[in-house]
Amino acid sequence: MVHAGYFVLGLLTTTVSAVNNVADLVGTWSTKSRNVLTGPGFYDPIQDKLLEPNLTGISYSFTADGYYEEAYYRALANPTNPECPRGIMQWQHGSYVVDSGGVLRLTPIEVDGRQLLSDPCAADKGIYTRYNQTETFNSFKVYVDSYHNVQRLDLQKFDDSFMHPMYLVYRPPQMLPTETLNPVSHSKKKRHVTRETHGWFRLTDLVKREEILNPDRWLWLGLFMTAVGGFTFIYS
């Protein structure tokens, strides 16, 4: 019985060690499709635009010195019209810490985050906004996935549910520079971006008019939708 107790304790110690090993986080991780990756292929800070991947997915990157970046591209169900799903793209970066209890806390650079919400079957515009969302993960675990035989990252959210598993794609990580990329000036600048249309669901095809809004106002996103093609007007 004593030996069994030590055996169980050893397993628990191994698990905690794996969960709390910050060095294991380092790299770029992506969900199964591996089409969504952090870095310049998802967000172009010079043109200030999000670049749509071929498939939906999630990606996180972490550095050894406490910086992170994330990229989301998701389809949102439309209960009132299942044939018209909405799409959302989100990008942000900032710093992270892991506390003594193994809790992972992500703090984004407030002015840099971006979100694009599109709905092809509703009104005449989509909304491109600043996006700022701190995140807390109760735990993380890195291990070799027995099926795919690659390193896997499991993130447990603040409500104890788990995100979709992510798999290691790059180490060192593929990321944009970790400093502020879009410092806010007192004067507003307007830019015009032309986009061609090819289909009815791809986000780049759904955007007719996009606006960078004050982050305090982005809760109104649900009131605005998207139509096909045209010019994009971005305010920063």
Swiss-Prot record:
Stretches assigned to the Lumenal side: 19-217
Residues bearing glycans: 54, 132
Regions that span the bilayer: 218-235
GO process terms (BP): 'de novo' protein folding
Signal peptide: 1-18
Subcellular location: Endoplasmic reticulum membrane
Assigned protein family: Belongs to the ROT1 family.
Name by which UniProt lists this protein: Protein rot1
Organism encoding this protein: Aspergillus terreus (strain NIH 2624 / FGSC A1156)
